[in-house]
């Protein structure tokens, strides 16, 4: 079974083992179907847990795991990475992508000129914006069909058309 990172535990939250974690998933991603998680702390072996509850809130999520029911047990996991099975990811339509899959993609123009790599992504009211860095300058690319022509996750490449002003 393949797992992917969804966040890092930053602190305990409350008295019953609830934890607050910095989220690596975009706000609004549905995590309600997550029933198990792997927790990895440093170079230790991953440990599997049943998920009681997971709630996404802005750039964080709150996590409750079976057997983690005290402040002390939650505190012992601070700094750990939280991973969930690939199968627990919500299905996306053909033109939608998880942010984590876009991070690091090589960005090239339709003429083949290298611009950089996707370094970060942020939402706006109408569409996401991809931050491309590593070339001659940082470029903000709106996630619209006029700009983003093709995304090839197998080649780890995004082909773009630069509009005037970009």
From Swiss-Prot:
Coiled coil: none annotated. Keywords: Chaperone, Cytoplasm, Ribosome biogenesis, rRNA processing. InterPro entries: PRC_barrel-like_sf, PRC_RimM, RimM, RimM_N, RimM_N_sf, Transl_B-barrel_sf. One of its GO terms (cellular component) is cytoplasm. SUPFAM superfamilies: PRC-barrel domain, Translation proteins. It is found in: Cytoplasm. GO terms for molecular function: ribosome binding. The keyword Phosphoprotein does not apply. It comes from the Bacteria. The PRC barrel domain binds ribosomal protein uS19. Binds ribosomal protein uS19. An accessory protein needed during the final step in the assembly of 30S ribosomal subunit, possibly for assembly of the head region. Essential for efficient processing of 16S rRNA. May be needed both before and after RbfA during the maturation of 16S rRNA. It has affinity for free ribosomal 30S subunits but not for 70S ribosomes. This is Ribosome maturation factor RimM. The lineage of its organism: Bacteria, Pseudomonadati, Thermodesulfobacteriota, Syntrophia, Syntrophales.
């Amino acid at each position: 079974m393949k797992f992917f990172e969804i966040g890092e535990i930053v602190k305990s939250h409350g008295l019953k083992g609830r934890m607050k974690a910095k989220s690596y998933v975009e706000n609004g991603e549905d995590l309600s179907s997550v029933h198990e998680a792997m927790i990895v702390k440093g170079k230790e072996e991953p440990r599997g847990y049943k998920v009681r509850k997971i709630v996404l809130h802005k750039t964080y999520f709150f996590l409750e795991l079976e057997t983690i029911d005290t402040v002390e047990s939650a505190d012992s996991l601070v700094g750990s990475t939280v991973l969930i099975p690939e199968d627990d990811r919500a299905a996306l339509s053909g033109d939608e992508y998880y942010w984590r899959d876009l991070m690091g993609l090589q960005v090239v123009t339709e003429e083949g000129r290298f611009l950089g790599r996707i370094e970060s992504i942020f939402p706006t009211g109408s569409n996401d914006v991809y931050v491309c860095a590593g070339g001659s300058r940082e470029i903000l690319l709106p996630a619209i069909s006029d700009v983003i022509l093709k995304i090839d996750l197998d080649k780890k490449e995004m082909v773009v058309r630069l509009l005037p002003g970009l």
